[in-house]
C-alpha cells in the first residue's frame, strides 16, 4: 500500500491500537483499519495508506467525504446553534429542510415530516405510526430484509440471524413474507421477474390465510431494493400488487428507503421508479452525508392521529444535522448531478456485465444487478448447488474477492448470506475515478 505524508506517529498509532481493546466486541466491522481523513472517493488511514472507497460509509456519504458545501454548512450552523431539542422549540434548519424535502417527494400526499437520528429509529417511528393510525398490531416484513438493530427494527430484520442472536424474545406481532428473489427461493434455474412476482404473491396470500389476517395487519414494510439481503430490486409489478392489497384491507404500505434514498438508485427516491405510492416513506443514510439524521414522511391525516409527546427524542432533527441535510438537498438539485449518477452507473454495469460473460468468470458470477450506484454482484456458492457443476466455486468467494480488493487499495463490502459483493460509490464519482477503481480491481 502506498503511503502519504502527514500520517500519525508510531506512538499515536500504538495508543490508538491499544484503545481498540476497549471497544465493545459486539460491533462487527469488515477491517481493522483506522481512518483519519477522507476526500471525495478516497480515505486515508492513520498510518498514511490511501484507499479508494466504494462503500461510502455504507451508502451514507453520498456526496463523498468532506464535501465542501456540506462542510461549510456544518461549520456555519455549529457557530450559531448546535442544539436546543425539538421538544423545546423549532429550529430554522429543521423547518427549512422540511420544506426542501416536501418539494422532492415522489407523491404529494407525503406532506408531513418527523426527523429522528438513525435509520433504525425511523423504522420504529413508522411502526408506532402504523399501529396508532390503523388500530391494528401486526407488521409484515420480508425474508432478507434489514431494518436495523434497535428492538422493533431488529424484530423486522430477516437478512441474517446475527442481528438478533441471543436477544429473543423480540417484539411480537411480526410476520415474514418471501421476497421475490430467485436465490431466496433456492431456484436452480433463474425464474423470470413475472414468475417470481406470482410466487411471492401466492406466498403472501398464504401468510394472510394462515398466520396474520388482514384485519390484524397494520402495515407491510419493504425495501424497494433489498439492501443487506443482496441488493435485489423488487419487481414493480409486485409493489403495485402490494398497493392494491393494502388499499383493500386498510393496511399501510411502508417503503424503507434508508439505503435507496437520495439519488442512490439514480432518482431522488427509488419510489419514483416504481410508480407506487407508499403511505410512509423512511429515510436516513444519504440524507445528511454522514451526520446522524433520519426521517419518516407520511400523510398529515395519519401523522395527526398521534398525540403530542408520543413521538420525539432529545437529539432528533438536530440543527447541525439538518443544516447538512439542506446542503445535500441543494447539491442534488445542481444541473448534471443525476446525469452523472446515470453515466457512472452505466459505466460500472457495462464492465460488470462483460466480466460476467468472460470465460474466466462465466458460471461463477451468476448475477449483476441493482439500480443507479447501488450495485450487487452475486457469485455462485455452496449454499445451493452450483449452476455450472464443471466450475465448482470455493466457499466464501465474496469475502475472498473483498480481501483481494483491499490488498489493491480498493474498499468494497459484502452483503447477505449469499455470495454477494456490493459497490456503493459516492454519487459524485467521476468517470476517471470509476475507471481507476475498476483497474484497481482488474474489472
Locate the predicted segments by residue.
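Conserved N-terminal phosphate-binding loop of PLP-dependent enzymes in the Aspartate aminotransferase
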Residues: 2-443
Amino acid at each position: 500500500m502506498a503511503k502519504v505524508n502527514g500520517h500519525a506517529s508510531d506512538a499515536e498509532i500504538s495508543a490508538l491500537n491499544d484503545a481498540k481493546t476497549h471497544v465493545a466486541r459486539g460491533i462487527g466491522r469488515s477491517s481493522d483499519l483506522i481512518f483519519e481523513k477522507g476526500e471525495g472517493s478516497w480515505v486515508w488511514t492513520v498510518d498514511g495508506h490511501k484507499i479508494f472507497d466504494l462503500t461510502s460509509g455504507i451508502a451514507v456519504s453520498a456526496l463523498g467525504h468532506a464535501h465542501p458545501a456540506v462542510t461549510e454548512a456544518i461549520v456555519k450552523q455549529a457557530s450559531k446553534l448546535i442544539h436546543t431539542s425539538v421538544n423545546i422549540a423549532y429550529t430554522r434548519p429543521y423547518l427549512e429542510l422540511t420544506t426542501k424535502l416536501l418539494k422532492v417527494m415522489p407523491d404529494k400526499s407525503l406532506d408531513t415530516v418527523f426527523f429522528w437520528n438513525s435509520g433504525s429509529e425511523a423504522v420504529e417511528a413508522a411502526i408506532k405510526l402504523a399501529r396508532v393510525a390503523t388500530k391494528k398490531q401486526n407488521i409484515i416484513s420480508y425474508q432478507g430484509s434489514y431494518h436495523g438493530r434497535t428492538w422493533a427494527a431488529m424484530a423486522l430484520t430477516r437478512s441474517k440471524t446475527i442481528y438478533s442472536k441471543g436477544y429473543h424474545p423480540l417484539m411480537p406481532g411480526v410476520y415474514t413474507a418471501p421476497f421475490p428473489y430467485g436465490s431466496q427461493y433456492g431456484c436452480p434455474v433463474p425464474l423470470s421477474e413475472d414468475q417470481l412476482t406470482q410466487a411471492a404473491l401466492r406466498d403472501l396470500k398464504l401468510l394472510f390465510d394462515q398466520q396474520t389476517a388482514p384485519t390484524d395487519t397494520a402495515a407491510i414494510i419493504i425495501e424497494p431494493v433489498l439492501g443487506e439481503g443482496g441488493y435485489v430490486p423488487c419487481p414493480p409489478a409486485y409493489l403495485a400488487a402490494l398497493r392494491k392489497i393494502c388499499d383493500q384491507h386498510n393496511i399501510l404500505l411502508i417503503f424503507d428507503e434508508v439505503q435507496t434514498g437520495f439519488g442512490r438508485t439514480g432518482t431522488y427516491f427509488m419510489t419514483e421508479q416504481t410508480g407506487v405510492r407508499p403511505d410512509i416513506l423512511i429515510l436516513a443514510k444519504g440524507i445528511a452525508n454522514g451526520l446522524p439524521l433520519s426521517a419518516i414522511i407520511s400523510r398529515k391525516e395519519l401523522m395527526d392521529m398521534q398525540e403530542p409527546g408520543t413521538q420525539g427524542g432529545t437529539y432528533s432533527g438536530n440543527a447541525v444535522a439538518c443544516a447538512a441535510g439542506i446542503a445535500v438537498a441543494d447539491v442534488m438539485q445542481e444541473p448534471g448531478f443525476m446525469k452523472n449518477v446515470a453515466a457512472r452507473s452505466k459505466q460500472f454495469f457495462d464492465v460488470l456485465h462483460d466480466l460476467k460473460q468472460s470465460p474466466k468468470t462465466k458460471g461463477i458470477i451468476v448475477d449483476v444487478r441493482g439500480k443507479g450506484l447501488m450495485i450487487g454482484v452475486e457469485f455462485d456458492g455452496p449454499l445451493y448447488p452450483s449452476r455450472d457443476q464443471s466450475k465448482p466455486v470455493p466457499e466464501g468467494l465474496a469475502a475472498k474477492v473483498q480481501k483481494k480488493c483491499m490488498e489493491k487499495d480498493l474498499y468494497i463490502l459484502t452483503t447477505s448470506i449469499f455470495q454477494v459483493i456490493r459497490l456503493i460509490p459516492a454519487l459524485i464519482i467521476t468517470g476517471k475515478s470509476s475507471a481507476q477503481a475498476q483497474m484497481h480491481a482488474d474489472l
